Amino acid sequence: MKTFTAKPETVKRDWYVVDANGKTLGRLATELARRLRGKHKAEYTPHVDTGDYIIVLNADKVAVTGNKRTDKIYYHHTGHIGGIKQATFEEMIARRPERVIEIAVKGMLPKGPLGRAMFRKLKVYAGTEHNHAAQQPQVLDI
């Protein structure tokens, strides 16, 4: 019996909507990354993007455990000398709450062109509204 390999043009991708209200950031991000990769499917193939599209709502209400709300620090560099910037979890949630989930999930996906293609299927919104109603997303309880 030959090993099954999924073809990119035959992969069926579904749309799911997830409510992040009260969910722990890391536990939510691991499940999102697993579904974006397609590892929950029987036809999973490592070198083919077999994952689903995922819409995350209420990103501003995601939870973290312990003192991470004030102690967790996100760093980025502007590219200029001495241009390292930092922001705490609270500041990130206040400024751009979508980025918190995006950063967590992106770190759990493969690095390279395939990982970037998987990441593009993640749509994160701070509120309860999204503009993907035409795709008829199913509610996914994580």
From Swiss-Prot:
GO cellular component terms, A-Z: cytosolic large ribosomal subunit
InterPro entries to which the protein is assigned, alphabetical: Ribosomal_uL13, Ribosomal_uL13_bac-type, Ribosomal_uL13_CS, Ribosomal_uL13_sf
Keyword match Phosphoprotein: no
GO BP field: negative regulation of translation; translation
Gene that this polypeptide is encoded by: rplM
Superkingdom assignment: Bacteria
Protein name: Large ribosomal subunit protein uL13
Gene Ontology molecular functions: mRNA binding; structural constituent of ribosome
Assembly, per entry: Part of the 50S ribosomal subunit.
Keywords on record: Ribonucleoprotein, Ribosomal protein
Organism: Pectobacterium atrosepticum (strain SCRI 1043 / ATCC BAA-672) (Erwinia carotovora subsp. atroseptica)
UniProt function note: This protein is one of the early assembly proteins of the 50S ribosomal subunit, although it is not seen to bind rRNA by itself. It is important during the early stages of 50S assembly.
NCBIfam families reported in the protein's UniProt record: rplM_bact
Pfam families in the cross-refs: Ribosomal_L13
Record field: transmembrane: none
Family of this protein: Belongs to the universal ribosomal protein uL13 family.
